[in-house]
Amino acid sequence: MQLADHSHLTYCTNIHPGESWSAHFEQLKQYIPAVKQEVSPDKPFGIGLRLSNTASLELSKEEALSEFKAWLETQECYVFTMNGFPYGGFHHTVVKDHVHTPDWTTSDRVLYTIRLFRLLAALLPEGMEGGISTAPLSYKLWHVRCESEQAAVMETTTLHILQVVEQLVRIHRNGGPSMHLDIEPEPDGMMENTQEFLDWYLHYLLPLGIPFLEDKFGISAEEAATAIRNHVQLCYDVCHFALVYESAENVLQQLKQHGLKVGKLQISAALKAAMPEDAATREAVVDAFREFNEPTYLHQVIARKDDGLLHYPDLPQALEDAGNPAVKEWRSHFHVPVFVGTFGVLSSTRSDIEQVLQLQRKQPFTQHLEVETYTWGVLPAELKLPMDRSVSRELGWVLQQLELPAR
């Protein structure tokens, strides 16, 4: 839905299963009208669409796309952002690090992303900008042998991303919408934090991209740099940045310093807890985390020590090291409901969301806001509610924080 500050708020449909377009469309028809009725009954409701590769191929067929556009019009809904991170199965299967497959070293990722942008261009309301979030190049733990291997991966993935940028520039120059690819750092991705995003942008994307666009379009270096900044932005997933103990002020200040933009704010919360020195008290905390140990998604844990951070690739590895006396705090990658602040002896990083939304309210830094709690299906039973009620409650909570009515 469009808010009074002209930004748009939605939720990501990766919450709904369905890897084929027909299955996912059935989910949208089941839940979107109820959510809209609850949070935006009299105004158009925006959708944050997630399509698997299979679904994107099916929706690209003229008949399917026409049917979807007609449904959107009938329901007074519109699509303004997409989630292009998970390519394949995302529900009822073991996802773990396969969420990065295929990564940006492959042409499959390029073709999938370009296809999504063509669909988004066909769906966007006239005059509205669009964005698609994507994986942070690759999974870092696949490329740990040497620095030269990592550098080669960074170069290959960047050149592939520039193929997408070329298409976005062409679409816009030919009268189509302005759209941006929103890179989403996350723990153990090739980009995990603001500094790694900046290092990539300044040392790979711009140096490779400026001559690439100069050659493709006959434009100046300054025009090429501007095009890159417009078409490649940051997807600021609040959960992911909270996991690496970064404040919103730090993230936004560094981006502003280098003239970079936030294409999408993904509103999500992680689990956290102090790790007490007392063995019995610590064991209660560890037992609480153990309740969230499930086999579908990666639940990276980043522990805070007095002298830095300690990374565990998944919750089981952290549980094995639970007695480490140097560890003062755990934060675990588990998108929990944003309206819940505590889970027994565990807390959420909801305060990080409150801080970033306060900054958005004071001085808007993005037009796209998307709630992304995709783990409803694997949450402990006591946290599960009917899907439409859960989504509506999350969106309502965000609106309260923003103190902005629908426009």
What does each model-identified segment do?
Residues 171-319, 327, 336:
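Acidic/histidine-rich catalytic cores of soluble enzymes
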Residues 1-127, 131, 163, 228-235, ...:
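N-terminal pre-domain/capping segments
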Residues 57-61, 92, 142-144, 192-196, ...:
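A short acidic (Asp/Glu
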